[in-house]
């Protein structure tokens, strides 16, 4: 391989990651580490407020406020009227308002058009664009890769560094390509595909990698499904997930408030069409999934890798040879209150949560509403629907989705993160069981001793009206 500037240059076909990464390199720090320019810095109330306060304490200005955007989502109440935001949430929101105003940062505030979960509003406003490098102090920033962006979460010190310099130092990750090929079976969604992948490779299967998703199932998938796929990349340990932009991407982005307009749009699309892995590009790891073999998925344990088809049975630790894995399964079963070998379908549930940066977009609510239409939430079940943004809420109301949910006995709430991370006291009570469209089922994630099963919006709605984990394929019209 040739050497340029003291660095070995790979002249083989380039991956999508390499093309976007190389466009953002300001300086090489070492053989595998670079100083990168950041195109978009997204802030939320939890990390953004603290980062801005930290910057002010150092007497430093925000370097590029016009490339920084903020919204409250984590610590705000999603109750009607925003009633009951806890003291910490009120303080974080007040700080976010004060510091963004002082710094000239655009804030999409509560009840304003554009407010919502940061990983929902980025794409819908056109802040997230193909080829962009996007960071946020949140692990699910990988969501934006569904539009062909290089997007990843950063820590608190990195957040302050980006505010001060509009740059970040990063080690280039290894590359993995996951090819989803085949026709999507009835009742199977993007959420099922990514959960099945996590179950296949494990929660650490993507550690150290940037994962590019490809294949016929991805090419035929709408953008909101692609965002769901990329959202859970971090749950298989990956730094980022990304999908090559195509005509579906361009049609989605066109006309959004922050998207290029006029001649700039044509120039942008011309550039974006080059953002795909070359046919001879080499990946460090390849995984192929036949989507025709996938059925609706549901998690049973305390990690996203603890997943099985809805017609499956809870694993029996006695069948596991590896002592460490057997012990982990025993702990998970004890926490979840499940019997080894029992069918997962029919497991009684107490709560259903439809929301989060994974599954709170309009298409998600439509899928859940289709199941809820004409049915009632089962006795003893509390079911919440939390739209991902003010825009999603507005559009859902315009379609009458809110009425479908309310008539069925669901609680229709305001945009925010809510029960995904037990924010603002919005928790599943101890010992109770939830089916959730969110991304993590860790111990205590939805509240102390809360038991969480991850599923698609349609599967969650099926659980709400059945009072138990149910196969949505028997209910969809």
Curated annotation (Swiss-Prot):
[4Fe-4S] cluster binds at residues 357, 417, 420. It holds the Pfam family Aconitase. Binds 1 [4Fe-4S] cluster per subunit. Keywords: 4Fe-4S, Amino-acid biosynthesis, Branched-chain amino acid biosynthesis, Iron, Iron-sulfur, Leucine biosynthesis, Lyase, Metal-binding. InterPro entries: 3-IsopropMal_deHydase_lsu (IPR004430), Acnase/IPM_dHydase_lsu_aba_1/3 (IPR015931), Acoase/IPM_deHydtase_lsu_aba (IPR001030), Aconitase_4Fe-4S_BS (IPR018136), Aconitase_4Fe-4S_dom (IPR036008), IPM_dehydratase_rel_enz (IPR050067), IPMI_cat (IPR033941). Pathway: Amino-acid biosynthesis; L-leucine biosynthesis; L-leucine from 3-methyl-2-oxobutanoate: step 2/4. One of its GO terms (molecular function) is metal ion binding. Belongs to the aconitase/IPM isomerase family. LeuC type 1 subfamily. Heterodimer of LeuC and LeuD. PANTHER family: 3-ISOPROPYLMALATE DEHYDRATASE, HOMOACONITASE, MITOCHONDRIAL-RELATED. Catalyzes the isomerization between 2-isopropylmalate and 3-isopropylmalate, via the formation of 2-isopropylmaleate. This is 3-isopropylmalate dehydratase large subunit 1. It comes from Bradyrhizobium diazoefficiens (strain JCM 10833 / BCRC 13528 / IAM 13628 / NBRC 14792 / USDA 110).
């Amino acid at each position: 391989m040739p050497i340029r500037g003291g660095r070995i240059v790979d002249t083989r076909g380039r991956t999508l990651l390499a093309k976007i990464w190389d466009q953002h390199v300001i300086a090489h720090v070492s053989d595998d580490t670079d100083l990168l320019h950041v195109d978009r810095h997204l802030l939320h109330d939890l990390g953004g407020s603290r980062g801005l306060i930290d910057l002010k304490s150092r007497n430093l200005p925000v370097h590029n406020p016009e490339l920084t955007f903020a919204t409250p989502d984590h610590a705000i109440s999603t109750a009607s009227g925003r009633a009951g935001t806890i003291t910490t949430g009120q303080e974080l929101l007040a700080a976010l308002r004060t510091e963004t105003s002082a710094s000239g940062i655009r804030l999409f505030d509560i009840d304003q058009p554009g407010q919502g979960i940061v990983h929902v509003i980025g794409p819908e406003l056109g802040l997230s664009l193909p080829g962009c490098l996007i960071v946020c102090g949140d692990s699910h920033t990988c969501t934006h890769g569904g539009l062909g962006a290089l997007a990843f979460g950063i820590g608190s010190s990195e957040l302050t560094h980006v505010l001060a310099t509009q740059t970040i130092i990063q080690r280039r990750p290894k590359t993995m390509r996951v090819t989803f090929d085949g026709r999507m079976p009835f009742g199977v969604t993007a959420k099922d595909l990514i959960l099945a992948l996590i179950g296949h490779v494990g929660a650490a299967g993507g550690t150290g990698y940037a994962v590019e998703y490809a294949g016929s199932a991805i090419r035929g998938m709408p953008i909101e499904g692609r965002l769901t796929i990329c959202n859970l990349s971090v749950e298989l340990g990956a730094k980022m997930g990304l999908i090559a932009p195509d005509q579906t991407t361009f049609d989605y982005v066109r006309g959004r408030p922050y998207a290029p307009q006029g001649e700039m749009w044509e120039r942008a699309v011309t550039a974006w069409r080059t953002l795909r892995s070359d046919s001879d590009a080499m990946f460090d790891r390849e995984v192929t999934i036949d989507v025709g073999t996938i059925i609706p998925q549901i998690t049973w344990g305390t990690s996203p890798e603890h997943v099985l088809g809805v017609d499956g049975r809870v694993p029996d630790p006695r069948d596991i040879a590896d002592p460490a894995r057997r012990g982990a399964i025993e702990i998970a079963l004890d926490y979840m209150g499940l019997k080894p070998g029992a069918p997962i379908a029919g497991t009684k549930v107490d709560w259903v949560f439809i929301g989060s940066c994974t599954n709170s977009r309009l298409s998600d609510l439509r899928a859940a509403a289709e199941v809820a239409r004409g049915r009632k939430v089962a006795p003893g079940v509390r079911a919440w629907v939390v739209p991902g943004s003010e825009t999603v809420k507005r559009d859902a109301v315009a379609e009458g989705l809110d009425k479908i949910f309310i008539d069925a006995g669901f609680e229709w709430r305001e945009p925010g993160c809510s029960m995904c991370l037990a924010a603002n006291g919005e928790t599943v009570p101890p010992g109770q069981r939830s089916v959730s469209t969110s991304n993590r089922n860790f111990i205590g994630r939805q509240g102390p001793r809360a038991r969480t099963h991850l599923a698609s919006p349609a599967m969650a709605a099926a659980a709400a009206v059945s009072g138990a984990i149910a196969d949505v394929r028997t209910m969809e019209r």
